[in-house]
Curated annotation (Swiss-Prot):
A motif (LXCXE motif) lies at residues 103-107. DNA helicase activity requires Mg(2+). GO terms for biological process: DNA replication; symbiont-mediated perturbation of host cell cycle G1/S transition checkpoint; symbiont-mediated suppression of host innate immune response; symbiont-mediated suppression of host JAK-STAT cascade via inhibition of JAK1 activity; symbiont-mediated suppression of host type I interferon-mediated signaling pathway. This is Large T antigen. The lineage of its organism: Viruses, Monodnaviria, Shotokuvirae, Cossaviricota, Papovaviricetes. Its main location: host cell.
Amino acid sequence: MDHQLTREESQRLMHLLKLPMEQYGNFPLMRKAFLRACKIVHPDKGGSDELSQELISLYRRLEESLPCLSTQDFIETDILQIPSYGTPEWDEWWKEFNKDFDLFCNEAFDRSDDEQEPQPDDSAPIILSPTYPARSQATPPKKKAKMDSPNDMPADLMEYLSCAILSNKTLPCFLIYTTLEKVELLYNKLSEEVLSPRFNQVDHKYGRKYVPIFIITGTKHRVSAVFNYCATYCSVSFIVVKGVIKEYPLYCHLCVEPYSVLQESIEELNSEFFDAPEDAAKNVNWVAISEYALKINCDDIYLLMGLYKEFQSPVPNCSKCENRMLTNHFKFHKEHHENAFYLQLVENQKTICQQAVDGVIATKTVDMAQMTRNEQLAARFDKLFERLEVILSAQSSYTISMFMAGIVWFENLFPGQSFKDLLLELLECMVSNIPKRRYWLFTGPVNTGKTTLAAAVLDLGGTIYISDCYLIELEVANSQIHGCVEVLAEKVKIRLPPGQGINNLDNLRDHLDGAVKVNLEKKHLNKKTQIFPPGIVTSNEYFIPFTLRVRFCKKLVFKFSKYQYLSLKKTECLGRYRILQNGCTLLLLLIYHCDLDDFAESIQGKVRAWKERVNSEISVSTYLEMRQCCLEGRYSVCTKYSNANTAQ
């Protein structure tokens, strides 16, 4: 190596490699330094072309003077000279290879008892050949001691344990199975650190060296988390951990033969720490909650949770059941009391109620897709009949006289016009749903009854209410259109701050037309395409653009009436009980003035019953008297009937 490079060249090479001269000859280190230096001095890396050529030239000259340092070359050369095993050439090569080695040992060993093979003749040397390989005298490795440990829990405990292998479910109770020596350590560690055992340590008498530990933790954990924690203290000893699904039965089973309690942190546990055996199998009835939400037509998750929470109170002393005013309570309290008690114990109350609400929305969607609009309106009338049964019960503050006062107020709203015919025409427009013939415009001065009538129609047909037509409110309202029969857009403004009502409504021309389906969005749900429902638009005396005027089939002009204003002011019960905004008022108006054949056949029985009840309590003379009082701006509820009903 020194003969290829001069002293000066060697020093120059080590300088380029940035190595001290003491490392000259340490070829592996010089090789690494060479590769590193090539990256530094290479022209493409910003180095010098002259230094790069000088480094490579010196290193190549040094490398040529060295013998082959790769063992792979020797191995490949040696392998090429050895013939294939099992051939006559290999036998000849093997004899030639071993001819200079004398492995004979003139020595005798005492024969052990377990040796079965005969000793070879001492006079002949042992020849190492493929046919007679030499016997090794090395000490064989010791076999690992076989641990006779169980792989699973005792069979009599399996019915109380979870057999899930790959599960992320968290549990509060676990059973740990390990050796008797590790039990005391684990019991103390579980008490001090991660987990807190509430009770007991039990001796398994089938071998008396394996012991289960039954623990309950403050919070829920995965089985794998408990196993990993215990495994840190059981590197040699076996450990089995399983979740407990029947806590109290397992505890009782471990307290009797063939088990015995060694130690427990709380003595003589009772069922209060667990679910009772008869209650363990009981769960919240999701179907019952879904059926309840469907019966009361509740699509608000928080309202449903609140209503169902009221069922937890005892039935005998419930004031709402005694008053019998809220049908969504007193009709279902007794039936759902027990299920409401179990609902308060679970953590996924919102999930359960959300599923029930989704079921209501799904039912509405199916009804909209399969039922005709006549059938939908008849179903709405049927629900209003149920409401009338409740609010006109014996314990209610409502009276038929109040509703008749509301009827005569509506009949005097448009002098010279039949309000019954006007209402029937409006309902016919909503039911027929003809494109560009489906929206009505209520316009007029302030405080003339536009919103009052529109709200009553809204409650009669089951509509959605849009106030002022703000853009953000329209976006929210679009998500609520699903399942609606009609729409009310109220207080549409123009040229007044903020004054964007007409502009926003003008952007909904396709919605108002009803000729094509439009996309309706709801949060967290996909877009739904449907015909936008018909409806009513209320507005003050503003200019309506032509693009909107052509989409209104009728325009009702409201005018201020002093006698209507005074009558409403003096008849306080109409405002206090919101009689005029109640759809039941318009329904009773139709029942009172229309023939039985004008109604759908499915509800004619209820119409006949209510017509008889109204005629029996309100005579024709009483009705005419109430109407005259309204025209004169006086108290319009029949005083005689009202006092008689109050005395009762």
